[in-house]
C-alpha cells in the first residue's frame, strides 16, 4: 500500500433528531395532554490510534466522513434512537490539526495505541412538546429542533513512532542494515534514493523475545534537505519522535582530507530543520568495510581513534561488526526523549440556552 503521511479531510457529526409535537388521543380522552418524545442525539466521530496501520492512504481515497443522524421523537413519549458513532482508525503517531479560515490549530496527538479522541460531537436531540407543558400552557404546539452536529476541516499528519532512526546520505546501506537488524524487507539497490518512504523494522532480543525495539529507515538525506532538496524535509519530521539515531556513512564516501564530512552534512541538515535533534544520542556507523583494502580500513580506524569519535565499523552485507553494533543499540534501549507533555483540551458541551426552538402548529 502506498505510504501517505499527510492528508486533509472534513468530518460531520450526526444531527440530533427533532423533538415531536404530539398529543394524547384515546377513546373518551379527545383532548389529552402533550406526549411528544425527544429526538435522539446525533452520532459522534471518534479517532482511534491503531498500531496495525502505517499509512494515511485510506484518507486520501475518501476525504469526507459523516456520522449517523439521531432519529426524531415520536408520539406516546417515544424517544428517537441515538445516531451510531463513527470510529475512524488512524496510525499511531498521527497529529490532528483543525483548519479555521487561514489558521490552523493543534487538536490532539495520537501517540499511543488505543488512544481515542472525540473529534466531532453529535448534535443533541430536541425535546418533545411534553417538556413545555405548564399551568399556563396546557397544549404546547412546539418542540425543540435537533442540534446540528459539529463539522470540522482537519489536516492529519503522520510522524512515525520508532525507538531509533537510521539516517545517512543516500546509498549508505541503511536499508541493508535494517534488513540485517530486523525482519524488514525494504527495496535494496546500489543507487541513491532506493528508499522513497520510511521503512519500519522490529529488532528482537535473541535472549528475551519480549524485548523489542522499533527501527525506522529514513530515506537518504542530502545537503539542502531542510529546504526541500532531494526527498526534502517531508521525511525529516519522522526523525523527531525517535529516542536515538543510528547514523550510517558509507566507506565509499570517506575522503582522506575530511573523512567525516558525510556525518557533518547530515547533522547540519538536522540542525537546520530542528536544532533540538542535535541533542539526540547518535551511534556513528561506517558501513561497507568489506569493499575497502585492509590498509585503508586500518588507516580510517586510526583516524577515528585519534579524533575521539566512537565509530562502529560494519558490513551490513556480510554481517561483519553487526554483533557489536547490536550490543550498543540495546544499551541505549532505555533512553527516553524528554518531549514536552501537551495537555489536551476536551470538547466543551453547550448550554441549553444555545438550543433552537422550532414552533410547530398542529390542528385540534
From Swiss-Prot:
Transmembrane segments: none annotated. It is found in: Cytoplasm. The keyword Transferase does not apply. Residues 162-334 form the OBG-type G domain. One of its GO terms (molecular function) is GTP binding. PROSITE patterns: G_OBG, GTP1_OBG, OBG. The keyword Hydrolase applies. Keywords: Cytoplasm, GTP-binding, Hydrolase, Magnesium, Metal-binding, Nucleotide-binding. Mg(2+) binds at residues 175, 195. An essential GTPase which binds GTP, GDP and possibly (p)ppGpp with moderate affinity, with high nucleotide exchange rates and a fairly low GTP hydrolysis rate. Plays a role in control of the cell cycle, stress response, ribosome biogenesis and in those bacteria that undergo differentiation, in morphogenesis control. This is GTPase Obg. It comes from Lawsonia intracellularis (strain PHE/MN1-00).
